[in-house]
Amino acid sequence: MIKHQFKLSDPRLLSRIGYQFKQLELLQLALTHRSVSHKYNYERLEFLGDSLLGMIIANYLYHAYPNENEGRLTRMRATLVRQEALGKIATDLQLSRCLILSTGELKSGGHHRESILADTVEAIIGAIYLDSGDLNLLKDIVLKWYIPYLDHIEPTDQLKDPKSRLQEYLQARKKPLPVYEVVDIQGDAPHQHFKVECVVDGLPKIYGEGSSRRFAEQAAAAEILKLLEQ
């Protein structure tokens, strides 16, 4: 049950977010993982925040890049709203210390799991919108979070997803394509957590995790690319 006398474990979170909640229980809900409660958790707020974030970023890109076509704008948006980008936002906001997790989830490292942190960012976006009812205010807050990343986004082919980039990298060097295999699935559908192994000739096995097989494969491919680009 959501507490009406909720106290943040880190009061400075509000300052980092850049918004003072009138209904603090909405922020509490946005920070609460389903391992704590199947009914009172961030998943509905995440659903709302995901749509709002996509709209905010799409609107920004539409006006910032008037000469780019739909395909490139789509890739740019995907780069800015994917799990990896949201994980960086979560790190900037220092969300890991504020998550409300079950004891088991906490012990398993859930407070550092990128998928949980990314979901929480989207849930906070949904919570701010419901609390303020002000889309323009929400847009300003979200774009402030993205300031360190917007200046570095470019409409190039590098904005392809990690799996596509890894495949092109290997094909260009006439090397075998990567092999992906699911090695672990936790939870029940539709709230599962996947762990995927990625094997590339000449490199150690790399693992990626995510809320779907696709996200886990992308995470693994991103780690392989980091190794190859060193």
UniProtKB/Swiss-Prot annotation:
It catalyses: Endonucleolytic cleavage to 5'-phosphomonoester. Pfam families: dsrm (PF00035), Ribonucleas_3_3 (PF14622). This is Ribonuclease 3. It comes from Acinetobacter pittii (strain PHEA-2). Mg(2+) binds at E46, D119, E122. Digests double-stranded RNA. Involved in the processing of primary rRNA transcript to yield the immediate precursors to the large and small rRNAs (23S and 16S). Processes some mRNAs, and tRNAs when they are encoded in the rRNA operon. Processes pre-crRNA and tracrRNA of type II CRISPR loci if present in the organism. HAMAP family: RNase_III (MF_00104). NCBIfam families: RNaseIII. It comes from the Bacteria. Its EC number is 3.1.26.3. InterPro entries: dsRBD_dom (IPR014720), RNase_III (IPR011907), RNase_III_dom (IPR000999), RNase_III_sf (IPR036389). Its cofactor is Mg(2+). Residues 161-230 form the DRBM domain. It is found in: Cytoplasm. GO terms for biological process: mRNA processing; regulation of gene expression; rRNA processing; tRNA processing. GO terms for molecular function: double-stranded RNA binding; metal ion binding; ribonuclease III activity; rRNA binding. The active site is at D50, E122. Residues 10-133 form the RNase III domain. PANTHER family: RIBONUCLEASE 3, RIBONUCLEASE III. GO terms for cellular component: cytoplasm.
